[in-house]
Amino acid sequence: EMGYDVSIEENGRTGKKPLHWEYLENKDRKALHDSYSRLIKLRNDNPELFTSTSQFSWEVGTSNWGQGRFITLSSTTKHMLVAGNFSKTDGAYTVTFPVTGKWYDYLTGDEVEVKDATQKMEIPAHSYRILTTFPCLN
């Protein structure tokens, strides 16, 4: 994904579209591309989090709009928490982690020490955080 400027209807919805690799020269489009690449890598490198045997919970309904939205995935050895703020203002949201200990901000690589399973997390407006119990390996 690079923020395409060509309509989905050009050459039909599923028709071939011109490739615009020059988009990667724009820092915002490069950042968007890199974010999608890391999300795909997360999915491909950690299949055990995305199987029918993993534990999955989500709080993403309309009633969760003001309290933040959360998705939690757990396997026997790994945990992932996605926390999103889809409002117009920055927020501090109560987050419940499945385990305490060392976590990682998957998109920045920063370590996060989780001492209490329930704690507040700052999330800017229109943003999200992905926290994992394993580091992102480039």
Spans of model-derived segments:
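Short, glycine-/Ser/Thr-/acidic-enriched flexible segments
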Residues: E1-Y4, F86-T89, Y128, C136
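Glycan-recognition and catalytic regions of carbohydrate-active enzymes
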Residues: M2-M80, F86
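Conserved protein kinase catalytic core
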Residues: Y4-S7, G91, E111
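Short hydrophobic-aromatic micro-motifs
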Residues: L81-A83, I130-L131
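Surface-exposed beta-strand/loop patches in extracellular or lumenal glycoproteins
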Residues: F86-G101
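Solvent-exposed beta-strand/loop surfaces of large extracellular or lumenal domains
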Residues: D105-T118
